[in-house]
Amino acid sequence: MEQTYVMVKPDGVQRGLVGEVISRIEKRGLKIVALRMNVIAEATAKEHYGEHAARPFFPSLIEFITSGPSVSMVVAGKDAIKVMRAINGATNPVDAAPGTIRGDFALDVGRNVVHASDSPEAAAREIAIHFKDSEIANYSRVDEVCLYE
């Protein structure tokens, strides 16, 4: 099973959307194998978003991500990265389809509720930033036999 990193950003937590996000993940057949709520440290945020360090929005992004609690998850399942990005919708809420998390709940590209890894390499890097291997559970959902061939 493929794994991906997912974060409910501070705006999603503050708006009470954590349960909605988790529900959509699980209803789609993915499973949450690690979960934590915390205020992400500035150094961790800078490591996570390091590829954007030269961009003009980087300081405000770091300020936002560290402004309050977020929920970090490792999500697993068949094609978890692609499926999770489809659940989230386009990064810019204006372009996000109705029925996606961002299409239904996001208001602004800078406050777009959720983050999910965009590639296997990014997923591995982001998971390692936020979780130790010992914090990731290995279990089977009882409905996996119905979900996958």
Swiss-Prot record:
Pfam families: NDK (PF00334). The keyword Ribonucleoprotein does not apply. One of its GO terms (cellular component) is cytoplasm. The active site is at H115. GO terms for biological process: CTP biosynthetic process; GTP biosynthetic process; UTP biosynthetic process. It catalyses: a 2'-deoxyribonucleoside 5'-diphosphate + ATP = a 2'-deoxyribonucleoside 5'-triphosphate + ADP; a ribonucleoside 5'-diphosphate + ATP = a ribonucleoside 5'-triphosphate + ADP. This is Nucleoside diphosphate kinase. It comes from Methanosarcina mazei (strain ATCC BAA-159 / DSM 3647 / Goe1 / Go1 / JCM 11833 / OCM 88) (Methanosarcina frisia). The lineage of its organism: Archaea, Methanobacteriati, Methanobacteriota, Stenosarchaea group, Methanomicrobia.
